């Protein structure tokens, strides 16, 4: 059956032709416009039921995002470090999908708010999906993973007032292998936006960065990033100047220089970034931490999120013990046994050897919460010196941070100033004097 003039025939989801997609079956009385809807009105029930379920629940963090397809190309040989297929062979290209986001804001928030930026990339390798998740900061906010939920809540709206709260922000406290730290550096360089421009755009163009990415790709101006790694051998850990497992530190570049791996380019727009499940899969040759992301993806996208096209591997998948549940798209493996080591359906396995040479740990299991030490302020002190050496850097820093300190309780403000004092004693006094000056100006203005 086809519609006149080759226009698509309007149907219900089951294919049943619709005479009028805007009509409602109802009990009519007289000439009024109202009536009682009948339960036999399949079309109305379908439309309303779908509307209430058509959106994927908003993510707890990184809710506002844009996405794009692209490719990763190997530029330098790193086969001495890994046997991961997608990283070996100069010129080898791998399809990728990237999601770029803010962190704290909800889905309707502005792109230009002062916030960390998230970066999630999915590599469609010949050996399966490889996920990477990064932030644009060289360090992470916290050491202890149990503090992760609280840290993110402190960046969100106050549960009582439902508005962002600076008090919450400041109140929260051959089988062999090597360790690497990844760096994605934009080929166009790093460009920042001053606070006044960001505030103005937040009102005039809240989707500023989403539109900028879409338009750039649409006109062929593809953004690209150089992909680098820092490398540390297991035997170097003992004498390393930092704890390499502490994400609040950077690795010294003079001791662990950047090594070029390849280039990542975004060249095709993607309209469904919420379908993208992040940091859920790794391939042989790469080790990573996946604890937090898998449950989050199962909750928001669904238990079979890995079967959605954006999350589906390009190589053949056979995992018959992962079946059933909402959103199954793979035929559910038919009558194959749903348990391992079945003689009814023998399978072959990979024989790539992983030698845990360095994976022998000596110690006692104990409940532990990290404390702040003087060593923790060494890298921030170096960063503060760099800021002071830049033209206008010190002034811009004060302009950005002072508004967040004005309206918080005095005791908490003094604690924050004490922390800045441990970075640099002069910085503490500069902040205190600036706050006192603002307080006097506000008092005189009343």
Show the residue positions of the predicted features:
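Active-site-adjacent core segments of small-molecule enzymes
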Residues: 1-446
């Amino acid at each position: 059956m086809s519609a006149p003039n080759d226009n698509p025939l309007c149907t219900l989801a089951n294919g049943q032709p619709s005479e009028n997609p805007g009509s409602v079956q109802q009990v009519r009385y007289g000439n009024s416009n109202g009536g009682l809807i009948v339960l036999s009105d399949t079309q109305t029930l379908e439309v309303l039921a779908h509307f209430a379920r058509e959106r994927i629940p908003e993510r707890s963090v990184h809710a506002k995002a844009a996405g794009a397809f692209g490719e990763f190309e190997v530029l330098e040989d790193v086969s001495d470090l890994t046997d991961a297929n997608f990283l070996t062979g100069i010129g080898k290209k791998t399809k990728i999908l990237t999601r770029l986001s803010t962190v704290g804001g909800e889905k309707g928030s502005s792109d230009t708010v002062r916030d960390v930026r998230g970066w999630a990339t999915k590599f469609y390798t010949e050996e399966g999906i490889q996920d990477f998740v990064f932030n644009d900061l060289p360090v992470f906010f916290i050491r202890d993973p149990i503090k992760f939920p609280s840290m993110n809540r402190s960046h969100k709206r106050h549960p009582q007032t439902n508005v962002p709260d600076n008090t919450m922000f400041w109140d929260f406290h051959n089988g062999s292998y090597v360790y690497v730290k990844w760096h994605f550096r934009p080929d166009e360089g790093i460009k920042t936006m001053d606070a006044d421009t960001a505030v103005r755009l937040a009102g005039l163009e809240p989707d500023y960065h989403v539109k900028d990415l879409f338009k750039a790709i649409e006109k062929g101006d593809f953004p690209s990033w150089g992909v680098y790694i820092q490398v540390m051998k297991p035997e170097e850990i003992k004498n390393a100047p930092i704890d390499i497992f502490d994400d609040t530190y950077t690795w010294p570049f003079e001791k662990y220089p950047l090594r070029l791996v390849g280039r990542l380019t975004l060249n095709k727009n993607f309209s469904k970034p919420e379908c993208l499940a992040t940091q859920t899969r790794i391939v042989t040759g790469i080790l990573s931490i996946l604890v937090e992301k898998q449950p989050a993806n199962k909750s928001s996208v669904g238990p079979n999120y890995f079967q959605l096209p954006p999350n589906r591997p390009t190589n053949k998948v056979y995992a018959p013990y992962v079946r059933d549940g909402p959103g199954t798209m793979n035929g559910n493996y038919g009558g194959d046994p749903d348990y391992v080591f079945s003689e009814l359906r023998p399978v072959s396995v990979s024989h790539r050897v992983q030698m845990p040479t360095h994976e022998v740990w000596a110690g006692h299991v104990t409940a532990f919460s990290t404390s702040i030490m003087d060593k923790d302020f060494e890298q921030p002190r170096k960063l503060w010196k760099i800021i002071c050496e830049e033209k206008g850097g010190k002034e811009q820093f004060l302009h950005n941070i002072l508004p967040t300190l004005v309206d918080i309780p005095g005791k908490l403000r003094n604690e924050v100033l004490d922390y800045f004092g441990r970075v640099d004693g002069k910085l503490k006094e500069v902040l205190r004097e600036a706050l006192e000056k603002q307080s006097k100006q506000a008092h005189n203005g009343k």
